[in-house]
Amino acid sequence: MSKNIAEQFVEILVKAGIKRIYAVTGDSLNFLNDAIKREGSIQWIHVRHEEVGAFAAAAEAELDGLAVCAGSSGPGHVHLINGLYEANRGNVPVLAIASTCESSEFGTSYFQETNTIKLFDDCSVYNQVANTPEQAPRMLQAALQHAISQKGVSVLGVPGDLFEAKSEKNISSDLVFKTNPRIIPSEEEINWIANQLNSGKKVAIYCGIGASEAHTEVVALAEKLKAPIGYSFRGKMGIQYNNPYEVGMTGLLGLPSAFKAMHEADIVLLLGTDFPYVKFMPTDKVIIQIDDKPERLGRRAQLTRGFAGKIKDSLINLLPLIKINDNQDFLDKQLDFYQKVKNNLRSYVEDKGKENHISPEFVAETINQKANKDTIFTVDTGMCCVWGARYLEATGERKLLGSFNHGTMANAMPMAIGAQLSHPDKQVIALCGDGGLSMLLGDIATIKQYNLPIKIIVFNNRSLGMVKLEMEVNGIPDNETDMVNPDFGLLAQAFGINGINVTDPEKVETAIQDALAIDGPVLVNIFTDPNALAMPPKVGWEQMKGMGVAMTKMMLDGNLKEVADTITSNYKHIKEVL
């Protein structure tokens, strides 16, 4: 009996190593759903919202190298969009199968018709529609190959009637090829980099996620150069651990130590980073960048020279040419300052807060201390990113996932679904904001349906905390950032999972410890301080002025209590400003 296209697709996906598809089934996807069920190797994960499926696929792809989600014609396509933007901007390989209305109805404004080429073009590296049995397998292989090779999203539109059509023999390959090329600067370029670094008395290294696989080489380079090492949020888990030269992160979520090291150096070496915040980059230094995507060179900093290369391969060639710097005064100065910064962070943890105003720093540090050495963390965009960036420590085995480039809310819980399904033996903890969790709350039902032992920690500050801070820094009294939330603990129980509410700071440690010990999903709803602020590495006069203006306007509007609470909650930042 001949196969139909849906069955042919499943065969190719199995050969590519696909274990699951995240989707909401629908009429144009039904033949694919049925083929998956009958073949038996791939699990159909019934999410409640396609956006959650795309986020989950993005998480699995970042951890394992390739994942698949799907959406049916019309609304199913539109619901995928935000999650696919996240995957594409995060440079992770995801295949999105977008089943469409029947091909005979194309261009007629048919029920649930969407133009997938137009719709997905800005969030994909490959975007095509298969119209014939001959095209279908070739396009599927091409879509998978593009996703892997270009590290992005491939979208393949497939008319619902094509899935049930008789398949034709594929005239090209059914296999997907995961390559690992060696990319290094030329000999002349390596020599130039070595000469520059050897001539520098004060060198600072800044690493992104592209340097994560080169931990040993980065540390060896820093040892020779006596160079402090800073890193991006995404690069933290791959660089921070077992690293006597690290000085933390810079950027909006970072610490003044990395900012200081980069600005006091005479040479800055950027490794595998596409760090987007130009204001935190020095401008009067020799700046050298190495990246495996040469199109990124120079778009974030005023480079002296840029080079194409994988970081590990490049440093292996570079290290023998680097001379040992016997003077470590610059390094010692930066490490001493970093120790003061870390001591300051500890002081925030010691202040646990009060009833219904629990210190979020204390909560994050408690999670860090109680979590396993190989935990996979997911963090919501917003204040959860701040607390995760500053308090979740790398071990060499931990992973940290978030929306670091796209910056979407509501990502942490869906990403935890993908992380837990693909790594059932690992502890997965989602640090969720109340705003983010509220957006896609319904997929707690997915966690329950598959009995995923995810631990959801809600930083419930009853506000859009980051937006509130952004408004106040710009001199605007916050407006419509407050949230009237449901009882998340009770809601969790209504979904059929464990739910715990915590309002007393003295009960935080026990609640988190108990939650992590439960063999099953748990939601811990912690009432954190809505007025807790996060100070960036460098606080300018305009920011202080803006905050002062906002507080004054709020007092004139009669919001004296909120102003008083903000001051009381953030007295600990005074020494940073001064």
Label every PLM stretch briefly.
Residues 6-14, 24-27, 32-39, 339-414, ...:
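Active-site diphosphate/adenylate-binding microenvironment
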Residues 24-26, 45-55, 69-76, 131-132, ...:
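Active-site nucleophile and cofactor-binding loops and adjacent substrate-binding regions
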Residues 51, 162, 292, 379-381, ...:
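Generic detector of well-ordered alpha-helical packing
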Residues 3, 215, 259, 309-312, ...:
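Conserved structured core elements
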Residues 97, 105-112, 298-300, 306-308, ...:
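Thiamine diphosphate
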Residues 1-326, 366, 370-373, 453-456, ...:
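N-terminal alpha/beta PP-like core and its mobile active-site loop of ThDP/TPP-dependent enzymes
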Residues 222, 262, 360, 440, ...:
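Active-site-proximal structural scaffolding
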